[in-house]
């Protein structure tokens, strides 16, 4: 285990940590929770809430969303605690609060554990046990399976670890239905297949960063071309999976048209990567992949509203 995870109990170190906590700002703690990741998780969870066949009281839905966002933030905080050593090496992550010293790693760990505990507990008490268990699985999977076990050991880390990020819509859906069915599993599948293509485009752009940090990403282990073919394959599978809501009568023709157009653009980006020698386009595809996923889930919400209000 990296040296940064060990705790020092000397009086001087304790005083320094307490002083840093006192000087930490709310913005520092917000950054600790990886707000961009948290927002995407929340939005996909809201989609799960929206398309669920049952109804839930607005207060309970708000509590569920709060628990999901807090749980995602908790996972992000603990991830930053564990990865503080490699984050300090990588250009992309060197400004994280656990690296700059704005928040001591031990404080990040404590903060994350407290958030995780209360998010799961409140979900169990106020919403239902199934959504609470799923939230616990999502947090644990991201921290233990992905961050601590897979990330530094295999280039397939994101393929397996991506399951954690694919759970929020299932949690949102189960918060309403108190069950799991093919509808929410379809949402899970879309995000699960989307995650590798999303992450590998970023890894193409930051290959040197990951090399310095000794993290076995796909471009380093299998090469650039293999990675680009893998991105194309997963992008294709994502686009196909995104059409499933139409063919299972969850969404209508409007959804199919919009998702297909977004999917074609996504595939065009993936195809053009082969002519992207400096990996500049890879970063653009990374940004578009976020827009793509947001749009797919937005289309589902719009379709649900059209059906609910009988808009013709």
Swiss-Prot record:
It holds the Pfam family UbiA. CDD domains: PT_UbiA_Cox10. Pathway: Porphyrin-containing compound metabolism; heme O biosynthesis; heme O from protoheme: step 1/1. The chain crosses the membrane at residues 31-51, 58-78, 107-127, 130-150, 157-177, 184-204, 229-249, 250-270, 286-306. GO terms for biological process: heme O biosynthetic process. Belongs to the UbiA prenyltransferase family. Protoheme IX farnesyltransferase subfamily. It comes from Orientia tsutsugamushi (strain Ikeda) (Rickettsia tsutsugamushi). Coiled coil: none annotated. It is found in: Cell inner membrane. Converts heme B (protoheme IX) to heme O by substitution of the vinyl group on carbon 2 of heme B porphyrin ring with a hydroxyethyl farnesyl side group. HAMAP family: CyoE_CtaB. The gene is ctaB. It is a multi-pass membrane protein. Keywords: Cell inner membrane, Cell membrane, Heme biosynthesis, Membrane, Transferase, Transmembrane, Transmembrane helix. It is an enzyme of class 2 (transferase). One of its GO terms (molecular function) is protoheme IX farnesyltransferase activity. The keyword Transmembrane helix applies. Its EC number is 2.5.1.141. This is Protoheme IX farnesyltransferase. Carbon 2 of the heme B porphyrin ring is defined according to the Fischer nomenclature. One of its GO terms (cellular component) is plasma membrane. It catalyses: heme b + (2E,6E)-farnesyl diphosphate + H2O = Fe(II)-heme o + diphosphate.
């Amino acid at each position: 285990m990296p040296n940064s995870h060990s705790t020092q109990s000397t009086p001087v170190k304790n005083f320094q940590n307490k002083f840093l906590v006192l000087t930490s700002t709310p913005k520092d703690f917000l950054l600790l929770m990886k707000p961009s990741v948290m927002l995407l998780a929340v939005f996909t969870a809201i989609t799960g809430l929206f398309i669920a066949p049952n109804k839930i009281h607005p207060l309970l839905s708000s509590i569920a969303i709060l628990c999901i966002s807090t749980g995602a933030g908790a996972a992000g905080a603990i991830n930053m605690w564990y990865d503080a050593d490699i984050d300090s090496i990588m250009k992309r992550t060197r400004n994280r609060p656990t690296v700059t010293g704005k928040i001591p790693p031990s404080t990040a760990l404590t903060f994350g554990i407290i958030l995780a505990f209360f998010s799961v507990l409140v979900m169990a008490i106020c919403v239902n046990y199934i959504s609470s268990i799923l939230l616990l699985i999502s947090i644990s999977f991201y921290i233990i399976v992905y961050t601590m076990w897979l990330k530094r050991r295999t280039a397939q880390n994101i393929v397996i670890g991506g399951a954690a990020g694919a759970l929020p819509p299932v949690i949102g859906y189960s918060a309403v239905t108190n069950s799991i069915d093919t509808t929410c599993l379809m949402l899970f599948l879309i995000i699960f297949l989307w995650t590798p293509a999303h992450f590998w485009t970023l890894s193409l752009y930051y290959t040197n960063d990951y090399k310095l940090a000794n993290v076995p990403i796909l471009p380093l282990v299998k090469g650039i071309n293999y990675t680009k073919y893998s991105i194309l394959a997963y992008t294709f599978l994502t686009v196909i999976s995104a059409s499933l809501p139409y063919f299972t009568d969850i969404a209508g023709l409007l959804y199919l048209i919009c998702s297909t157009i977004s999917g074609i653009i996504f595939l065009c980006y993936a195809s053009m990567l082969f002519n992207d020698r400096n990996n500049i386009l890879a970063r653009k595809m990374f940004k578009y992949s976020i827009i793509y996923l947001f749009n797919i889930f937005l289309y589902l919400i719009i379709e649900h509203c059209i059906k609910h209000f009988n808009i013709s």
